[in-house]
């Protein structure tokens, strides 16, 4: 197996040395280059293209955002953002510009360096699973969420007096690459959709609320972080809180959400399997499962149960997903499903959730 070449970009010499030393100790990493800002990093990329980059965002001369914009136009290379927990908005902005994932600088951990090392081990393992096609692909995916919603979105998103129960519920699972893909998907959803959406995006605590707020600005569907026993409403999406799991439960006025601790032995949190299994139990053929990009097999067991109970299962085409693991696991589990590119997924969800499909 070929050794990976890494580039560490950070204006702090201490951070550069620390991250480089940790990467140098990992199996599979053969060489680590260093750069103190975006301009220097671009020169390194031109001279010796790395297999992946760890990137600080706040730097002099050419900051991380400008660097990402130039890099994705010239040399699409996997970028992992290294940022503090207080910089959540910046992290999601970087993901929209093309970064594939992030790791949080540990401040309050008992053993912060060990926490950082564990995250780096996970991310380096991820690099080898990335789809080259997805990395070369559509740079128009660098979507801006800072703009106000379109006129059409503003019109249909005006608050209503009554929350209508949805005809169907779309449950979505995603991991690495998910935030960017979800932005694309939500921009192509239709305002006549007779459904609610519940999203299990693998993400640590304290990040999911910011993600929900940014996703809320993308189009016609309102988005918020899921709350305990919140009743599902048509035209609304709910993001599972980081570090917790969400299950769909029955109520006297339609399906609702229960925020719970992960099941014993759950490796991925928020758990896609836990969400999908609850949707299968409560909703049966009124549930639609969607498995997007991500490492591992979370969602495969839940998709099998959902399909067994009559629900539809859609997966992002593994060949074009940033990380094929999760959708590929559904395919290998012999679950009845449809495999579509991200543009096709939006259209298919619209077809399955039309009011006349009830």
Language-model-detected regions and their locations in the chain:
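Conserved acid/base catalytic micro-environments in cytosolic active-site loops
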Residues: 1-7, 12-28, 34, 39-47, ...
């Amino acid at each position: 197996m070929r050794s990976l070449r890494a580039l560490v970009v950070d204006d702090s010499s201490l951070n550069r040395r620390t991250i480089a030393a940790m990467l140098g100790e990992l199996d599979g990493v053969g060489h680590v280059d260093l750069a103190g800002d975006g301009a220097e990093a671009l020169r390194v990329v031109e001279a010796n293209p790395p297999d992946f980059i760890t990137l600080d965002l706040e730097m002099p001369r050419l900051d991380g955002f400008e660097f990402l914009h130039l890099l994705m136009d010239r040399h699409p290379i996997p970028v992992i953002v290294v940022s503090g927990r207080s910089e959540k908005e910046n992290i999601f902005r970087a993901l929209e510009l093309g970064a594939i994932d992030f790791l949080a600088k540990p401040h309050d951990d008992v053993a912060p360096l060990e926490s950082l090392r564990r995250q780096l081990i996970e991310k380096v393992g991820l690099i080898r699973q990335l789809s080259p096609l997805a990395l070369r692909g559509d740079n128009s995916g660098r979507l801006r969420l800072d703009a106000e919603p379109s006129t059409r979105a503003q019109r249909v998103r005006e608050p209503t007096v009554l929350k209508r129960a949805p005809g169907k519920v779309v449950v979505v699972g995603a991991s690495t690459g998910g935030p960017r893909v979800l932005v694309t998907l939500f921009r192509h959803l239709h305002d006549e959709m007779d459904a609610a959406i519940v999203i299990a995006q693998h993400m640590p605590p304290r990040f999911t609320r910011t993600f929900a707020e940014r996703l809320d600005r993308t189009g016609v569907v309102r988005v918020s972080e899921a709350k305990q026993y919140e009743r599902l409403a048509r035209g609304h999406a709910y993001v599972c809180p980081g570090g917790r799991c969400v299950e769909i439960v029955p109520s006297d006025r339609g399906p609702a959400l229960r925020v719970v601790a992960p099941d014993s032995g759950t490796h991925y949190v928020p758990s896609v399997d836990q969400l999908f299994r609850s949707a299968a139990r409560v909703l049966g053929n009124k549930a639609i499962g969607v498995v997007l990009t991500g490492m591992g097999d979370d969602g495969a067991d839940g998709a099998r149960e959902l399909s067994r109970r009559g629900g539809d299962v859609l997966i992002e085409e593994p060949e074009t997903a940033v990380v094929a693991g999760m959708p590929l696991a559904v395919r290998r589990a012999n679950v009845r499903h449809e495999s579509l590119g991200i543009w096709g997924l939006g259209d298919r969800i619209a077809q399955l959730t039309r009011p006349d499909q009830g």
